[in-house]
Amino acid sequence: MVPTTESHENNMPDNAAITQQQQDATTSSSSSVATQPPQSQIPPQPQYQYQMAPPPQTHHVHPHHVHPHHQQHPGYVPSHHHHHQQHHHHHPHHVGVPNLHHSIHQQQHPGYVPSHHHHQQQHHHHQHQHQHHQHQHHQHQHHQHHQHHQHHHTSPMGAGAGAAGMPILSMSPIGAYQPPHQLTSLYVGDLAADVNEIILNELFSKVGRNAIASIHVCRDSNTLRSLGYAYVNFFNNHDAERALDTLNYTLVHGKPCRIMWSYRDPTKRKTNVGNIFVKNLEKGVDNAMLYDTFSSFGNILSCKVEFEKGISKGYGYVHFETNDSAEKAIEKVNGTLILGKPINVERFVSKVERYKVENKVFFRNADESITIEILQQELSNRFGEIESCILKNDANGKSKGLGLVEFKNQEDAQKILTESGALIISTIDGTTTVSSNGGTIEINGKPITIDRIKSKVERFTEYRKKTTDLSLFINNIDESIDRDLIKEEFAKHGTIIGIKIVQDENARNKGFGFISFSEIQEAQKALDSLNGFTFGSKQIQVSFSNKDNNQINNKLNGNSTKITKNIIQGGASASQYTGYLPINRYQQHLPHQHINPMYTQQPYFPQQQQSSSSSQPSSSQPQPSSPSHLNGNTTTTSPNTRYSKTLNGTTPFKKSNLPQNANGTNNNNNNNNTNINKSNNTTQSNGFRNKRVPNGKPRYNNNNNSSNNNNNNNTTTNVTTTPSSTETTTPKTTITLEFITNATAEEATETLGSEVYNLVLAKYNNNIELAAKIAGMIVDAVPEHKELFEIISNGQIQSKIEEAKSLLDQPDQE
């Protein structure tokens, strides 16, 4: 039999039925061959199809190619011999290469040739164009025939299956080759946790065996657990449409899967065009029922009922492809019954647009005697028709005095807000702004506070701004002092509206707290009077929790403080040894602007050996010490000595030195500060960290601050000018949740890190290196910006700082 480009169906043996069925399952169009990829795109694993061999007289095989076994089986010719005969004039170096594998195989199977023989015959008229392609194919021929012998004994194909125009059957797995055209993707959601790619392949193969290009189940990167959704890619759009129409909401492991078109462009997913909102749904309405209800009005891109813990929330969303379909659905379905309950269908309104519509008002401070019926009657008679009214009750059914009122018309809601004084309309430079501070109306002779609906971020921002302007931060509280004693003492200076002393699990105070006054003048008076006041065995430190007020009134210990910059330069950074953020990350945002230029003229390098006295500053020279009031307006800090030892002296620290005169001695010769310097110098030279007295404050007498400052100012006037009291170490910016929300991730991290850095400085005597370490630890431990903001705002940051400090003390205590 001679292989031609015509069909072999009349001469097809019985065992060819297998191959013919597989070809019918894939495609029967002759154009499929033309769409096959070039040789460079075909995977290296060959694909075979077996055909009947041609009669021996049709092949003019070179005598050198004939093996002795060929004479015994004249009906079988290896395809590569025919290949040599066709291209003998192109590849003369291939002539006469015997193949032992073909000789053995001819004795066992004298009627078959590999499929590439027929494939090359089809392209014989293109040999000048594909000469290089066929040459590469021939170079791998011996290896391919060896694989052919192994495969033929396990799954032989019938002859005649490679008729003209029929595609070559792929023996590789589905999806091994992706055509160059664009794939069509479907999103498959609401999947069970144990559903994988194999299960989805069995489901979607009902559309067509070779219709699927790939399947990907999305999983958690850490646990590799399924996230409950997957993407199925199809070769063409028709198969994807058929899968969406026939397989949507099919049960997969007991859960109906939700299929929708996958849009990589986020603008198509987030657009509100054609999106409708369906509410007042019965609990039994699921995704499939909602889809069937609206599918007759147009092509649905997505359809979903909101569930919480397996229970329907009573509302859902339907996203149509066009806006006309959505309008038609609203007109026809709104008010219809589903499971005996009328549903409400309306256009979807985004959250941003919802807050712009002022048809709802919030009320609070309502008397217990006022019920919903009284509210509805009074408000509807005075302002307009009411759509709904909600009054919150506690667990015992007692009214909380707050709730929501929804008017049918937006004008009625604006009317009650205007008459109550809740809205403040102001015009500045032609720009009109509307603000709301809450107003009051009377119902049954009793006042009720009325305000507009505000978002959570807006409410928290207003609360934060109001409380920080009137709140004081109290630090260094003795553990034996309770809340009532502090409240009693602070109440002498004004009306207290709130007090919070942070306690541990044993109900003992942690040494800090917050107290709020009704007026800013009262808070200022309490700060002036009680800052440095002795409670028990400790002197408390009082400051405004608002940084703007701290900028003006930072009177800690009766002096304004200055912190010189301490930046690690050269060598390895500190974060390489501690695992935390570098020191200068949070320093660069601190407004420590007023720094004497003489402070940064001489770098300081910690020595590796304490015995290197030649390079150490002499004991007569005051070394940088722990925070103390040396000249009334400046303090410097020393590196943590244990930290320097960890670096083994390899990393230099650029250290600011105290101002010195020509002979190398310090200009500050005040006797009260001399003892402090000597104590700190001794501690530094011995290689230990700076010591603190039990109450956590430096050794100095607070009663001598006035005289010390006068003496210091007199002795240092030739070096620097004392800055005004308004220049302090605290930043000018006030952190708000609105700023954190709108800022970029990097800006929010830097801002919150700087805030934590300042708090650690105030808590641990301006220890710059310790502050940088702890700030880095806390920022890394709480990566969520809003969570860290709440920890800072409610005072929990102090406990986090103490925990970080205890962790730093554990590894290498001396």
From Swiss-Prot:
Keywords: Cytoplasm, mRNA processing, Nucleus, Repeat, RNA-binding. Residues 59-72, 79-94, 115-154 have a biased composition (Basic residues). Residues 184-264, 274-350, 359-455, 470-547 form the RRM domain. It comes from the Eukaryota. Residues 1-165, 605-730 are annotated as: Disordered. Residues 1-11 have a biased composition (Basic and acidic residues). It is found in: Cytoplasm; Nucleus. Residues 16-39, 606-628, 661-686, 701-730 have a biased composition (Low complexity). GO terms for biological process: mRNA processing. Its main location: cytoplasm. Residues 732-813 form the PABC domain. The keyword Nucleus applies. Residues 629-660 have a biased composition (Polar residues). GO terms for cellular component: cytoplasm; cytosol; nucleus; ribonucleoprotein complex. The keyword RNA-binding applies. SUPFAM superfamilies: PABC (PABP) domain (SSF63570), RNA-binding domain, RBD (SSF54928). GO terms for molecular function: mRNA 3'-UTR binding; poly(A) binding; poly(U) RNA binding. Belongs to the polyadenylate-binding protein type-1 family. Binds the poly(A) tail of mRNA. Appears to be an important mediator of the multiple roles of the poly(A) tail in mRNA biogenesis, stability and translation. This is Polyadenylate-binding protein 1-B. The lineage of its organism: Eukaryota, Amoebozoa, Evosea, Eumycetozoa, Dictyostelia.
